[in-house]
Amino acid sequence: HHLGVSIDEHQESMGRLFSSFTEVAEKSLHAWYPIKRTAEEIAYSSAENRLVAWPYTKYMNAMNQINQGAAIILMSETRALRLGIDRHKFIYLHGAADTIEKPLSTRSNFHSSEAMRVMAEQVFFGGDLSMRDISFIDFYSCFPSAVEFAREAFGVAPDDPRPLTVTGGLPFHGGAGNNYVMNSIASMIDRLREKPESFGLVTANGGYFSKHSAGIYSTTRREPSWSRTPPEKYQTVIDLIPDVSFTENPSGEAVV
């Protein structure tokens, strides 16, 4: 393992990671499974927690067929003021980034994501914020690997006290197909309104870690005015990474 830990140690660390997600889900009015679970319950298979595909048990898998919904109204500040909307409800975008990863067979390894690393840099690009300024986080959580990749890309230490979800995550809050992140953003908006002038980070990914997105939100306006960098301008950083050579007829020794 690239972290230098054993299979059992990694299994237990995944259990601890998602146990912390259940603590958030337990307190959520919208979580489909608002139940706090121990690391051991999550890490190891049981009658209630079958092994879906090694090393992931049921409690480590996204529940993405949940009957849920979320909605966000997007408009200009001028329009919102004209409609008489309370300014305390305003949420502003402070950063956004989207990247596309290389095909799976051409990536240099399977334990990190260059596209996610570039996204993590670009979502803060051109502003004064850093990860230290983020009070609330929702890392996309289809499986433990998605959270682990994001934690590495954004430089969040394993012992960082900030929860890595505001919903409880895909296995415990659940999601409506590919619309889970709408629930993440809506939940983030609630947190930011409760703590004005704080900042929240939401990430998303899809496919085989094929595409990534991130946004930073706050009740405060970004000054001076800002416009995002077109993703194609920094996508070239990823596209220019040399592909790993591929053969359909391997021979000789190999390590998996």
Predicted regions and their residues:
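A conserved active-site cap/scaffold subdomain adjacent to cofactor or substrate pockets
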Residues: H173-V181, L192-E197, L201-V202
